[in-house]
Amino acid sequence: MYYFLTASKDTTIFSQQAVQNTGLDEILEVSKVYYGNLKDTARSLVKFDLNTLPSKLSSGAVTMSEAQIVIRETQPSEIALAYSLHIHPISQSWEMGIGTRFDNISTDGCTWNYRASGSK
């Protein structure tokens, strides 16, 4: 049996745009770009609401011994033949924000420097 959880919020944060947010962008980015002296790192944050999972497990509606995250690439470019993605839990809350990558970058929500608008 499969039980699917979809993300309740997501955003990409960029080291070179350290106070800008792209929470409404349709693309999540994970990258390192080197151009001369410029180094731009992109990280994606994804939140899954797990609040209903304990009741589903205790009722028997969901039985599981493992969980998987499936990530799909769309139109990747310049990716090495072998690479690894490292996934880490986030220990504090963060805000998604309403920015998009190039058209509507905003300073609300999570950024490289802040987990919510202006708060570290």
Protein language model regions, located:
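Beta-strand-rich interaction/scaffold domains
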Residues: 76-120
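A short beta-strand-loop element at or near the start of a globular domain
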Residues: 1-6, 11-78
